[in-house]
Amino acid sequence: MNHRIAKSTILSTCLQKQQELIDHFNQRVEDVKAEAYNNNETPSQTDEGSNSPEEFLQTLGQELDFVRAEMEVLRSIDPANPANVVERGAVVVTNHRTFFIGVSSEGIEIDGQKIFGMSEHAPLYSHMKGHRKGDSVEYNKTRYVIEDIY
């Protein structure tokens, strides 16, 4: 097993990535607004349909709300709290992957180790929730052995 990466380092990296995602969505919203207004059109004057700037802005706004809500989930995690079971804020090391319970993410690399963010809404989380070190969980024909939790 690899060495334990400090939970505070994992959380800090996740917060940074989430902020970058929020910044990206904010910039995209501004770009779409600027493009619509530069074409002398307000969003409601553009063509109807799924490609209209108004609908696109609405979709972007919903996605921005979602990533902001995820940021609040991350901010609610206290890295000083040790975890003995799979729960929000836990780092869960399995025989397949290492997960950080909070929000879903593609994965971050710290000190050569890849850590995947897992949402409490993820199907795998519902199978792992409450389990302890040494327990095993089967999900989607894959057996996960929990090697460490902290």
Q: Which residues does each predicted region cover?
A:
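Conserved hydrophobic positions within beta-strands
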Residues: 136, 146-150
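N-terminal intrinsically disordered, low-complexity, charge/repeat-rich segments that act as generic
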Residues: 1-77
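Non-DNA-binding regulatory cores of transcription-related proteins
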Residues: 80-138
